[in-house]
Amino acid sequence: MMNKNYIKYCSILVMVCTTLAFAQTELNFTNAGATGQNGPTQTQINTAYDGTTLDDDVTINTQGIQEWTVPATGTYTFEVYGAQGGRSYLYGTSSWHDGGKGAKAVADFSLTQGDVLKIMVGQQGVEYARADRGAGGGGGSFVVLSSGTTLLMAAGGGGGAGD
């Protein structure tokens, strides 16, 4: 079974430092529990972010791509994680191989109030219960500055397990 702690961190964390006093806010963008080849819907996002600092601040105009407007000019630290690959049944035993863990990337960016970011959070690869094929790879996670479609960050997903 997939490491439960890794599921919690397969997300995009954005830490905002907007004042000289270094007040910090942490935003945690997730895949909202979406599975398969399509990302989350607006309904899934609304449910996942209800009661959080992202409540009512994220929209989905294209399924799977979250759009968020930068609320204040400042330096933003991004931690971007790719999703883990799916697990696969180990031939001749009653055990499973876990898929590879996704990459992690960290960087700081100066953003301006009103900038719109397009955020895609990878989803875990599909597991495979037969011993003759491998599981699906994890999805990559991406952050794009939508004004010029400039890629700010990317983290690749892990490979799917095989026999």
Q: Model-derived features: where do they sit?
A:
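Bacterial Sec-dependent N-terminal signal peptides
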Residues: 1-24
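Boundary/junction segments of secreted and surface-exposed precursor proteins
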Residues: 21-44
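Short, solvent-exposed loop/turn elements at domain surfaces
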Residues: 36-40, 86-90, 161-163
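Extracellular beta-rich ligand/substrate-recognition surface
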Residues: 50-62, 93-101
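Extracellular and analogous surface-interaction loops
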Residues: 57-76, 107-115, 143-147
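A short beta-strand element within beta-rich, extracytoplasmic domains
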Residues: 75-84
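Extended, low-complexity, turn-rich repeat/linker tracts enriched in Gly/Pro/Ser/Thr and Asp/Glu
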Residues: 84-89, 125-129
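Secretome/extracellular-domain signature
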Residues: 99-163
